[in-house]
Each structure stands twice: as C-alpha cells, then as structure tokens.
From Swiss-Prot:
Tissue: Expressed in pollen.
Name of the molecule in the record: Cation/H(+) antiporter 12
Lineage summary: Eukaryota, Viridiplantae, Streptophyta, Embryophyta, Tracheophyta
Function: May operate as a cation/H(+) antiporter.
Membrane topology (UniProt): Multi-pass membrane protein
Family matches, as InterPro entries: Cation/H_exchanger_TM (IPR006153), CPA2_transporter (IPR050794), Na+/solute_symporter_sf (IPR038770)
GO cellular component, one term: membrane
Keyword Transmembrane helix listed: yes
GO MF assignments: antiporter activity
GO terms (BP aspect): potassium ion transport; proton transmembrane transport
Organism: Arabidopsis thaliana
Amino acid sequence: MNTTSYIRGCIPLVFNISSFGFWENLKSPDVIFGYSLPLMEFQILLIFVFIIIIHSFLKSFGISPIPSYMLAGLILGPQLFNLREVSSRKLSWDPALDGNGPLRGLSVCGNIMLAFFMTVKISRRLAFNNGWLPIVIGTLSFIVPFLGGFCVRNLHTDNIDPYYMSPNKVLAERIVVISSQSSILLPTVVHFLSELKILNSELGRLVLSASLINDIFASTVSIFAYLVGTYKNISPMTAYRDLIAVIILILVAFCVLRPVVEWIVERTPEGKPVADVYVHAVVLSVIASAAYSSFFNMKYLLGPFLLGIIIPEGPPIGSALEAKYEALTMNVLIPISITFSTMRCDVMKIVYQYDDIWYNIFLMTFTGFLKMATGMVPCLYCKIPFKEAIAASLLLCSKSFSEIFLYESTYDDSYISQATYTFLITCALINSGIIPTALAGLYDPKRKYVGYQKKNIMNLKPDSDLRILTCIHRPENISAAISFLQFLPSTIVVTVLHLVKLVGKTVPVLISHNKQINRVVTNSYIHTANLAFSQLESVTMTMFTAITHENLMHDEICKVALEQATSIIIVPSGRKWTVDGAFESEDEAIRRLNESLLKSASCSIGILVDRGQLSLKGTRKFNIDVGVIFIGGKDDREALSLVKKMKQNPRVKITVIRLISDRETESTNWDYILDHEVLEDLKDTEATNSIAYTERIVTGGPEVATTVRSLSEDYDLMVVGRDHGMASPDFDGLMEWVELPELGVIGDLLASRELDSRVSVLVVQQQQQT
C-alpha cells in the first residue's frame, strides 16, 4: 500500500472552528464551509433571508411571523435546497461531527429559553384563581381526548407495512399522536392571545387557566410514559435510577435553589435591578438543568420547566431576565429553532406513505373533535355566548411553534416516522395562519364596551353623581389630577387607576387598593397618591393598579370604566413640562395609549395637558380662570357640559369663547340645532354672572391660530372639544401642521411646544361607542 497516497486521501475526524477566510484557497473559496463557524453563519444567513422574504409578503395579509419561520424551513428542506443534508458532511465524514451540530445547539438553546421564560412569566395562581370552569375545561380537555383516542388506537393494525414500522412501534406512534393532540402547550395559547391582544380579556383568562391545568396533566403523563418506556425498553434499574434523578432535581429546585432565589430578591433594594451576576447564574443553571434532565432520559425541557416555577414572576428577577435575554430568544433563537426543526420535513413522504399514516390522521381528527366538544360544552353550560365558546374551543385545539419542538423530540427518539412528523408540522403551519383570522371573526373584545346607554356628562341626570376615572402613569400626574378634581363639585365619585407596564410576566394583574391594602407598598408614590386622593373633600374614591402590557392598557382602562359606570375618563397627555413651564419630554407610549383609548372607550374622554400652572394653582387654593373655546359639534358640547359642573366652585371663573366663521349661516343640521340650544341655555346662565360668554369671528386658519394663541395668555386652563364636526371653521393651513392628532386642531395649538404660555389644556371627546 502506498502510505503517502493513503495519508493524502484521509479526511480528518476533527474540525476547526474559524477559517482564514476566502484567501485560504482562492481556487476553491467554499473551503471556508469546512469550518464550523462560517458554516453556521451561512446557515443562519440563509434562514433569515428566506424568513424576511416570506414575511414581507405574508404580513400584508396580517399573518404573524411564525408561519414565515415554518415556510422558510420547508423551502430549505428536502423539497428544494436540502440545507441540512448539504451541510451534514461539510465538516467531516464522522457522524459525530455533523455539520448541523452547531445550528442544532442554537435550536436547542432556543427551546430551553422559551420553556423557561414561559414558565417564569405565567402566574401559578392563575390555574385556580378563575373559578371552577377553567379547571373543568382543562381537566376534561386532556382526559376525554386521551382516553377516547386510547380506546381506538388498536384498530386497523392487521395491514401494517413492516417496512414502515413494526407493530409495536406503530402503536407507540399512535400514543404519541393521541397525547400530543390531547395536550395544550401554554406558549402556543399565549402567542395567539397576544397576537389578538386579548390576553387580559375574560376569554383570554379562561383559556390560559384551562391550558395551565391541561399542561399539568400532560407533563405528569409525559414523565410517567418516559419512565415506563425506559423500564420496558432499557432496564428496570435504569428506570428506577431516572425516577430517583427526577425526584432529586425536584428537591434541589424547591429546597435549595428556591431559598437562594428568595435571598437574592430580599437583598435587592426595592425599585433597583438585580445584579447581573445573579441573572447570568440563573441562565447557566437553566442550561445545566436541561443537560441533567437529558442525561437521565427525561426531556431536556423538564429542568428549565422546574426552574421556571421557582423563579418569581415580575421584578426584580423576572423583569431582569426578560430585559437581558427575551429579545435574543424570541427574535434570534426561536426563528432558528422553528426553521431548523421544519427543515426536517419531507412533504413527499406524506404522499408516498399515506396508506401507513392515514390512521394517524384519523386519530388527530378524532381527538381534536373530542377536545373541541369538551371545551364547548362547559362554556355553553355556563351561558357563555356561542361564538365565544367556539373561540375558546379553537384556542384549546390550536397548534403552533411550541408543538413543533414536542414533535421533534419524539421524532428524535424514533417514536414517530418522518411522514407523521411532516404531517403534524403541516397542521401546525395551517393552524398558525388560520386560527388568528378565525378568532378575530368570532371574538371581538370591544363588543362589551359598546355603549347601549349614554355614558357622558351631557346626558347625565341633574341629580346623578358625576363618575370620573382618572389615570396616572407617573408621580407628576397626581398633582394635576387632584387639582382638576378640586374644580368639580363635591358630589363626584372618583376611580383612580395607576397604570404600570407589565415586565417579567404574561398575564395582566388588576389590584384593588381598597380591598388589598397590604399590597400597597408604604414607601411608594402610589401610597402617597392613595392618601392624597382620599383627602379630597366629600369625594367617594376607589383606587386600582393595573399591571399590564403597553398595547393592552387601553383595554384595562375601558374595563374598569365599564365596571365603575364612568361618565368620563381623564388621562394625562404624553407631553411633560417642568414646573416653570418649559418643555421636558414626550412619551410616545402614552400617546399611543390615548389614541387607542379614543377609539375604544365606552364613555367620554378627557386628555389633560398640564404645563405646571394647573398643579401649582390647584394645590395652593388660588383662583382659576377657565376658558372654553366653543366652535360646535358634540365634543364641544360635552366640554361645555363638563365646565358647567365647575360653576359651583367659587374659585373658578369661567368664560366661554365662541369662534364663528365669517361664512356661517343658519342650518337645519341636527348638530347646529343642538349647538344653538346649548348656547341659548348658556346665555340664560350668563345672566346669573356664573359664566361669561363672548363671540369672535374668524376668517380662516391663520386667524384661528392667532386667536387661540392670544386667548391662551388669559387663562390658566382651557377646555376644548377634540372634533368640531360640520361646524368646523376653515382650518386651511392648520391640519398639515398638527403634531398631536389625538388632541385635535385646537388642542394641538394649545399644547404646542412653540406656544409661549403656561396654560394647561383639557381636550374632550364625547362618547363614541354607541
């Protein structure tokens, strides 16, 4: 044998991580793909290129990115590019040095972090804090489909193709199909609820609670099944060893790690972030627990799941973990995980092996029907509307990216064939695209906010109390809200809602400080606010804190307003001024919240822009000059109705300024008639010297702006309507310069940063949802 030629023909079993670049071999630059790092970078680049291309098309139909990840995997799979197979032998011919190994490692890390984050962010109290209905649904939705499928799993076993699977493996495959279709994975449900923005709705809470109960059953059965499989297929001794290992993991998690976590929380000052070293230590512990679980023949997600249970949701640890690792997990690791898992699908296997998997398809349909029924029947029994019952059942039956990881783990263990795996993934892909659209048509959370009664100030009965919901985001909102409330009559009912961005949690929380005083932190500004609002004379006050997602805050406000039968909601604007009236900052999140609130609230809305003058004069008992700019329309009439409530306060001097277009003529329009009636009533009131009335004629947009700016110098607070309907004067030249459309044209002029004035503004919109 020629030793030299033999050595020259050898392929090394080890591989290098990084290359010398294209210059290493100019004749064959693809030599860089013989190194693990460039190969992995190229794989990731291809994955995200296809994801971006696909999603740029699908997003125009309102489809979330998840189906794009799956479709990218199918394109890169055996049907077209076959990226896995091409990459497999790039590093070495040794199977242990598979070229897909590094990418597979990233995929597993994504699965681990997702399981951990979802467990941390879901409140364990959620399962049993929403009554008996979710407990019944969660229990039945697992037991009934599982037992129903188990009863028919042995049918049609006579004609099993031995080249497909052995009879015993076919039965095991059917059990996997039955159990996977009976289970409900929380990340999938949370994804759909978040996409539809109904996490804090009644339907969302019901489905989340039921899913958590179902998950408990599914996890227990899964652990038991793996122990039984180890007992039968490996050895009883190994099964006993694995059982002891699981018990040790549980004991270490709850008896050792949980006290350590509590110690970290206790030594972290309130309102301060937890030290980075603890955050990184938690993540390393999660990865170590996954390795431990895998070593003892359990699913590697068991360890992260247990550690997620012992980590307290929210600040300081939960929020710190979210801030440092969630963006990386959800935007990088999860797309890679989903695409990599989907690349293993071979759609042609479904066609070629249909005769072997048709009964699995039947089992999926059968168990899905049973789960749908067990979700609907309890809902209908509890008088839940039919469409909402269907929506709840669809959510319980939904499959998406979380199930992909479950299917892949069973495929890795050879419990299911590639044909069955591909069909399950295809069903998850179809679910991800169709379920959100179907749910949007079945369930609209805004329906409950539609006002079948007039919930505004103008239609309030004379002997009725004025019910106000005032919202606060920051400490500086408190003094402005209290000052404004002091101008109103003493017979008002005030609900204060403190809005807090949800961090480190998934499910929103609403805390009533009147019922749960012990949950109010004594040294926090919200405790000060509670005391300050309580000292308002002859005012009935209720206080809540809503901890929720930024894009769901408007829904929480609407829900509280509906429960409290509120006539008007007062919210701060996104602009912040210093005490001396200088512009300081603008909060775009608050502006977006106000815009959403204007579209969905079931009562009137008031957006308060405080330049400092209102807080200063209101708290120091100075007299206040209030001006109302009246042009016409229902918003202006509502603003006038609110201001007329202030006339009983001797500190408040009210002036109504009507702006009249030089081209205005009498009209039979209903709004014009109502405006005329309101103004006639106001002129009668003027005779009592409680409200002054004046008129000014304007000829166009520039004169409107000049008039409004001059008026701002004469008053401490100006109240205006947001929209003026058909009564609007010629606003030519003004609409194009509006910076804050949520305030309307006049409100935007008064809240402008260029306006040299200390005047505060309240922009009023009358109830829209009627």
